């Protein structure tokens, strides 16, 4: 049998242990889900009883696909493979419930869509708008990490525009939203916001520069 070089158990109370096989790090997790109570920034973890129940708690259909390793058979109860082919970001089941479970998913939807060149399907997009203020429940460190992945990704301008359009940016960096109200005073661009998007698009993927 394959034996790991080392095992770490830092996430054991959340149902996760890790194993390292040479250069590869593998996380082994039991069936579980996470949700945020209205007055807390820390997630509550609940353990499930079946694979389908576990997949039903995932954020988007493209992330709710499993594989039976011995046979190679895909387990795809929510149409994730079809959405992958169609380049669609779609919440699993009820989008309102998915974003209540973990409001960071509001930003993850934007990041996946921008970085992968996908589109957010309408019901999911409308739910993001409804729950945008809930991003304030998430720790600043997690919000920072998501924003960093967008800014250093292949389409930071698309990500920024989507954050503004979906109502998230006003809770993250509200000064960016205010750029839409500033004119360049007869320059080439309609407003400073459009100019900023063009600049970000054409700079190297360095966080300090972008």
Question: For each predicted feature, which ranges?
Answer:
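Catalytic cores of the polymerase beta-like nucleotidyltransferase superfamily
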Residues: 1-210
